[in-house]
């Protein structure tokens, strides 16, 4: 059935014709080839790439360009006609994929590779997968857009010529991008061929900057990781649909029970699903004497923090009802929406990048960290009572075990590693304290960072942890005191940078002279911070060294050579530089995880997903899980040993210790 009504009158014409299949070139021996797919993908924005997994999701045409050589657009499924023989095109491309050993170039290559694999075109001998939308955020991750057009303009190109395409779309009454599959191929061919040649031209200019910034190490790492992440999405994660059904029933039952108890106590009825409506739950809270503030719209202001602060069974019941409702309506529903034939095909974002649907804005995380979407597998229930039960819906491959291999205290170890290398920057005494920490790890790789620092400082573990995290994340003294549960004070700074309480005589004098008031650590908190800094000086000294480096050059360099950059403020100075240490250890930890994924994949290990500090595998036995852990520990030599905790089970939840019984 045709979806397209040919126009009665046309304002455009095209003399483009598809190439003769018999004249197409061999890719064997080519240094670089660019490739791009035009697709029909109606659910892309809502559910992510379909790649042939969902109905009406398929390639309509494939374009290629050999660097400094021939190329062409090969239409195969255009609704408007002008297609080449489907099997002939696929046979040609499958044959080229088998012999091509150079670099494959493109823009948003994972999207194209996923669709191509659906048609049996798989590039298993490629040297590197060079994606200009990976290269560009490596060169600078601070841009607002990483669309092909924005990247082209940054590198001095006009971008894609869409004039003919858009004019034809107007004649046919369709959207020129999402409905391109409807057009006759003759109106798409020229656009598609230029679309493929452009990344080759952009990449040449990007590579000069990659040379200038010495980014080849991290670019090669990301280029090796790209097909691995594409493979994770293509295969997907198995879902236990029976357990998913059970969890939905359990969550509905628990929500109903909680709301029934609220009614029993307060006399106010709240329907299932209404627990998120402030105006509905407000009467129950007011019944127990809670005075509620109003929003600017005049509605009761009831958020998570408020419910958590109320010491009363009704608040506890409402909070529980919200949690189990979210489990059912957000998490379970998202799995059902995205699941295809019992598997979830989520997208793993390597870097900040343009969204697959080419809409405004970007997807992905900064500083090299992986993120995921459609659905977000990195944002699953983790600390709730039902977290293990929920994660039990995620299964390994048939007949295998789920192995959760989790880096233990990855970022604190990275901080010790860098402090050991920074003697000239942090000073001899601070360096000695770092060496002391390093040696403790070398003597016992199971050393707990926060307890070690507590012992070194002679303070409680909880306090040592909060201070370490505060220094690592660039917190000020006042914020750290609030984290520690200690009082702060309003202070002013004297001429020699001394702090004075605003209520002291000197403080009042400085205020009268116009000194700026600000919140600072109180005496008790400051004494604790001073003790930590005196006994474990390398953390603060390293933080100051990172801040100084960021202020001077505008970036921090991580383990792989990645540059984590800082924006400039209105005065032209680098901003947020107090986050320098955080960028260093977060970015380097991300590098370590990515290096481990590449090394594990090259060793033939079967990665399922990556979440935070964890890489999950489908393994035959504990020996295989231990092999993966060994690679994770040793793929990046550090000044101290890395630790990887290994747990296996019949599902993700079972690997966490779930006993198979729902919470009461």
Curated annotation (Swiss-Prot):
The gene is gp62. It holds the Pfam family DNA_pol_A. Gene3D superfamilies: 3.30.70.370, 5' to 3' exonuclease, C-terminal subdomain, Ribonuclease H-like superfamily/Ribonuclease H, Taq DNA Polymerase, Chain T, domain 4. It catalyses: DNA(n) + a 2'-deoxyribonucleoside 5'-triphosphate = DNA(n+1) + diphosphate. One of its GO terms (biological process) is symbiont-mediated evasion of host restriction-modification system. It comes from the Viruses. Keywords: DNA replication, DNA-directed DNA polymerase, Host-virus interaction, Inhibition of host innate immune response by virus, Nucleotidyltransferase, Restriction-modification system evasion by virus, Transferase, Viral DNA replication, Viral immunoevasion. Residues 352-378 are annotated as: Disordered. Belongs to the DNA polymerase type-A family. DpoZ subfamily. Its EC number is 2.7.7.7. Coiled coil: none annotated. DNA polymerase that replicates the viral genomic DNA. Also incorporates 5-hydroxymethyl-2'-deoxyuridine (5-hmdU) instead of dTMP into DNA during replication, as an early step in the pathway of thymidine hypermodifications of the viral genome. As a final result of the pathway of hypermodification, 5-aminoethyl-2'-deoxyuridine (5-NedU) substitutes for about 30% of thymidines in the viral DNA. These modifications probably prevent degradation of viral genome by the host restriction-modification antiviral defense system. One of its GO terms (molecular function) is DNA-directed DNA polymerase activity. This is DNA-directed DNA polymerase. It comes from Pseudomonas phage M6. Transmembrane segments: none annotated.
């Amino acid at each position: 059935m045709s979806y397209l009504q040919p126009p009665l009158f046309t304002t455009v014409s095209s003399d483009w014709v598809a190439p003769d299949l018999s004249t197409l070139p061999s890719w064997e021996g080519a240094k670089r080839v660019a490739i791009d797919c035009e697709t029909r993908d109606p659910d892309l924005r809502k559910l992510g790439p379909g790649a042939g997994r969902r109905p009406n999701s398929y390639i309509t045409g494939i374009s290629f360009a050999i660097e400094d050589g021939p190329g062409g657009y090969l239409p195969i499924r255009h609704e408007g006609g002008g297609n080449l023989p489907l099997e002939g095109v696929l046979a040609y491309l499958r044959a080229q994929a088998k012999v091509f050993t150079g670099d494959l170039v493109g823009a948003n290559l994972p999207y194209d590779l996923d669709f191509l694999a659906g048609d049996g075109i798989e590039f298993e001998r490629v040297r590197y997968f060079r994606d200009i939308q990976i290269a560009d955020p490596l060169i600078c991750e601070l841009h607002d857009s990483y669309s092909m057009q924005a990247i082209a303009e940054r590198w001095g190109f006009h971008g894609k010529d869409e004039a003919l395409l858009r004019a034809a779309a107007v004649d046919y009454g369709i959207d020129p991008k999402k409905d391109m599959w409807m057009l006759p191929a003759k109106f798409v061919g020229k656009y598609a061929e230029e679309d493929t040649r452009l990344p080759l031209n952009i990449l040449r200019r990007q590579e000069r900057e990659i040379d200038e910034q010495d980014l080849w190490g991290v670019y090669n790492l990301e280029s090796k990781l790209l097909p691995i992440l594409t493979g994770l999405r293509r295969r997907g994660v198995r879902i236990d649909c029976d357990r998913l059904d059970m969890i939905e029933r359990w969550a509905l039952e628990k929500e109903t029970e909680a709301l029934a108890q609220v009614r029993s106590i307060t006399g106010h009825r709240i329907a299932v699903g209404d627990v998120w409506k402030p105006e509905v739950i407000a009467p129950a809270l007011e019944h127990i004497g809670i005075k509620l503030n109003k929003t600017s719209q005049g509605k009761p202001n009831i958020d998570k923090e408020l419910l958590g602060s109320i010491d009363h069974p009704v608040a506890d019941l409402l909070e529980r009802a919200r949690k189990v409702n979210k489990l059912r309506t957000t998490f379970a529903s998202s799995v059902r929406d995205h699941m295809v034939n019992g598997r979830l095909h989520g997208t793993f974002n390597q870097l900040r990048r343009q969204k697959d649907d080419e809409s405004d804005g970007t997807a992905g995380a900064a500083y090299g960290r992986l993120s995921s979407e459609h659905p977000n597998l990195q944002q699953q229930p983790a600390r709730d009572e039902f977290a293990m039960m929920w994660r039990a819906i995620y299964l390994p491959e048939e007949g295998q075990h789920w192995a959760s291999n989790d880096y233990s205290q990855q970022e604190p170890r990275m901080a010790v590693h860098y402090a050991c290398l920074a003697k000239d920057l942090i000073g001899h005494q601070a360096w000695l304290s770092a060496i002391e920490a390093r040696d403790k790890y070398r003597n016992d790789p199971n050393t707990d960072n926060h307890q070690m620092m507590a012992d070194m400082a002679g303070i409680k573990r909880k306090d040592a942890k909060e201070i370490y995290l505060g220094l690592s994340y660039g917190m000020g003294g006042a914020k750290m005191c609030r984290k520690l549960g200690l009082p702060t004070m309003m202070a002013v700074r004297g001429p020699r940078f001394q702090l004075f309480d605003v209520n002291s005589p000197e403080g009042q004098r400085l205020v009268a002279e116009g000194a700026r008031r600000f919140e600072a650590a109180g005496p008790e908190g400051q004494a604790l911070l001073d003790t930590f800094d005196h006994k474990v000086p390398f953390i603060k000294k390293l933080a100051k060294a990172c801040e100084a480096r960021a202020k001077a050059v505008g970036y921090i360099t991580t383990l792989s050579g990645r540059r984590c950059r800082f924006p400039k403020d209105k005065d032209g100075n680098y901003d947020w530089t107090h986050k320098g240490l955080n960028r260093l250890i977060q970015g380097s930890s991300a590098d370590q995880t990515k290096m481990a994924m590449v090394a594990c994949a090259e060793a033939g290990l079967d990665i399922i997903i990556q979440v935070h500090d964890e890489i999950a595998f489908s393994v035959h036995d504990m020996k295989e899980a231990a092999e993966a852990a060994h690679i994770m520990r040793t793929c990046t030599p550090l000044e101290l040993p890395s630790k990887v905790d290994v747990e296996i089970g019949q599902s993700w939840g079972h690997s966490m210790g779930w006993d198979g019984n729902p919470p009461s």
